[in-house]
Curated annotation (Swiss-Prot):
<keyword id="KW-0963">Cytoplasm</keyword>
<keyword id="KW-0808">Transferase</keyword>
<dbReference type="GO" id="GO:0005737">
    <property type="term" value="C:cytoplasm"/>
</dbReference>
<dbReference type="InterPro" id="IPR023506">
    <property type="entry name" value="Trans-aconitate_MeTrfase"/>
</dbReference>
<dbReference type="InterPro" id="IPR023149">
    <property type="entry name" value="Trans_acon_MeTrfase_C"/>
</dbReference>
<keyword id="KW-0949">S-adenosyl-L-methionine</keyword>
<dbReference type="Pfam" id="PF13649">
    <property type="entry name" value="Methyltransf_25"/>
</dbReference>
<dbReference type="InterPro" id="IPR029063">
    <property type="entry name" value="SAM-dependent_MTases_sf"/>
</dbReference>
<keyword id="KW-0489">Methyltransferase</keyword>
<dbReference type="GO" id="GO:0030798">
    <property type="term" value="F:trans-aconitate 2-methyltransferase activity"/>
</dbReference>
<comment type="function">
    <text>Catalyzes the S-adenosylmethionine monomethyl esterification of trans-aconitate.</text>
</comment>
<dbReference type="GO" id="GO:0032259">
    <property type="term" value="P:methylation"/>
</dbReference>
<protein>
    <recommendedName>
        <fullName>Trans-aconitate 2-methyltransferase</fullName>
        <ecNumber>2.1.1.144</ecNumber>
    </recommendedName>
</protein>
<comment type="similarity">
    <text>Belongs to the methyltransferase superfamily. Tam family.</text>
</comment>
<dbReference type="InterPro" id="IPR041698">
    <property type="entry name" value="Methyltransf_25"/>
</dbReference>
Amino acid sequence: MSDWNPSLYLHFAAERSRPAVELLARVSLENIEYIADLGCGPGNSTALLHQRWPAARITGIDSSPAMIAEARSALPDCLFVEADIRNWQPEQALDLIFANASLQWLPDHYELFPHLVSLLSPLGVLAVQMPDNWLEPTHVLMREVAWEQNYPDRGREPLAGVHAYYDILSEAGCEVDIWRTTYYHQMPSHQAIIDWVTATGLRPWLQDLTESEQQHFLTRYHQMLEEQYPLQENGQILLAFPRLFIVARRTE
């Protein structure tokens, strides 16, 4: 897969950071020592963690060399490791595992989430936020365009669901706080929606296409977005973006 583009990702930095801020606000830990930021990207979520716990040892994990380089440049006081979340092993038990908009890219959450809980110290916390927009027009249309143009399905899997995550984490020995929030982002144009998803959800669909194929895909995608997202009275577009939040505290 082609590498992530930090500049494109940070184009909507405020919108992408807001869920991390709101997730962090629900983590009731005080003096903690070891933190992992899984899927840290360019370090915007890591910066929030460092601001709240400046004395903690924070390790950011990401599989993208470009994202890791950007994060290291922005936060020289934190450790950043290029690794696959599924294979990375900390040197010590973690007081907090923070995963903002990263775990949705990984398969088999029935195994992944108990594994992450096993990395926590007693009373440690797993804090997770995942986009829950698999059924939103932005993502449904990606699949429809790919089908129209005879491209394979390269999208991520849908989330397991609120009840499934509650059971998975309860059985792993956690107290679970889980909620879902829908954000309505004001977009100036349909092209702005494409700019947003090109940095994330559209990447797998476009990565193996030629430049002309990508343009053909995006032209059709733009047409379909216009049909699904009407303009407001002031010309703006409201982009609904549901997100699932989980704060699980280990009790064992």
